[in-house]
């Protein structure tokens, strides 16, 4: 049995899309366990389990869903998948999981493109019910790693990376495989089998955009003489980037709705 933990927040528009791609690309039986926040009219009949409890932390919700899955699973070798609500398979994911988990304990997206993030990312992660329990899996942030600029950062999955590192657990990262990139982080294809929209439930702000903001020569000069000027200019530039990202996100979402093979434009 395959058990899938997913979270939808503030909108139900990804639910049917995700379910359709799951049915298309999984041949084995699977159950979906969902956390549905701020979506009072979201349908629940397609989920094996659904919670509407008002929990804010994304990581905590995933951890609780994993506990529920362990309690309902009958086999320690059942496959456990974590999947963001705006992510879904677009290729033969079941074969990939079976092949990878025959040699390693974890297969997960690693978003190196996000300024060098090292941790397994819960937009897609597969392991077994038994191993998650054995290692006391935890999606919360906390453990810090060095990004590509040598800065210490943490994010969701940080504590999971710590456990894998401390126990010397080998895992298989799925890396971004886009041939066409509309954005350096969003609209990602991983190993040609997983699509992750990115920021499908929130504003399109990300660390990699902020790190790449460059002030114009005039603004650089003025920032030397006017306290806080450079910071204000970076904030304005970031607001423009977020607005552009949101507009692009809506355009891509409309394409997803209209074209079941939308992902080929990125491959």
Question: Whereabouts are the PLM-identified features?
Answer:
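Active-site-proximal specificity loops/subdomain of glycosyltransferases
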Residues: 34-77
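Short beta-strand-to-loop acidic/aromatic patch adjacent to the donor-nucleotide binding site
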Residues: 76-88
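Conserved catalytic core of nucleotide-sugar-dependent glycosyltransferases
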Residues: 89-166
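Catalytic core and acceptor-binding pocket of nucleotide-sugar-dependent glycosyltransferases
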Residues: 134-226
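Membrane-proximal basic amphipathic "stem/tether" segments
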Residues: 215-267
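A conserved hydrophobic helix/loop-capping motif in glycosyltransferases and polysaccharide synthases
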Residues: 3-11
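Short, acidic, metal-binding catalytic loop of nucleotide-sugar glycosyltransferases
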Residues: 20-30
């Amino acid at each position: 049995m395959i058990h899938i933990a997913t979270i939808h927040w503030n909108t139900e528009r990804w639910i049917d899309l995700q379910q359709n791609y799951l049915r298309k690309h999984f041949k084995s039986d699977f159950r979906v366990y969902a956390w549905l926040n701020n979506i009072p009219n979201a349908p629940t009949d397609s989920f094996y389990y659904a919670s509407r409890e008002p929990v804010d932390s994304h990581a905590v919700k995933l951890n609780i869903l994993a506990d529920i899955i362990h309690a309902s699973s009958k086999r320690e070798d059942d496959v456990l998948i974590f999947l963001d609500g705006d992510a879904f398979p677009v290729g033969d994911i079941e074969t990939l999981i079976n092949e990878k988990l025959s040699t390693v304990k974890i297969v997960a997206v690693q978003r190196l493109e996000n300024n060098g993030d090292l941790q397994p990312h819960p937009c897609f992660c597969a392991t077994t019910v038994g191993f998650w329990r054995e290692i006391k899996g935890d999606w919360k942030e906390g453990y810090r790693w060095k990004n590509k600029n040598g800065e210490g950062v943490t994010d969701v999955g940080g504590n999971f990376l710590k456990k894998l590192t401390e126990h010397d657990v080998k895992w298989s990262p799925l890396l971004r495989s886009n041939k066409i990139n509309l954005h350096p982080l969003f609209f990602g294809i991983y190993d040609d089998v997983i699509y992750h929209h990115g920021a499908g439930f929130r504003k399109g702000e990300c660390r990699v955009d902020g790190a790449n903001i460059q002030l114009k020569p005039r603004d650089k000069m003025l920032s030397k003489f006017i306290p806080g000027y450079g910071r204000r200019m970076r904030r304005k530039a970031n607001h423009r980037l977020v607005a552009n990202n949101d507009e692009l996100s809506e355009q891509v979402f409309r394409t997803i709705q209209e074209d079941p093979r939308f992902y080929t434009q990125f491959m």
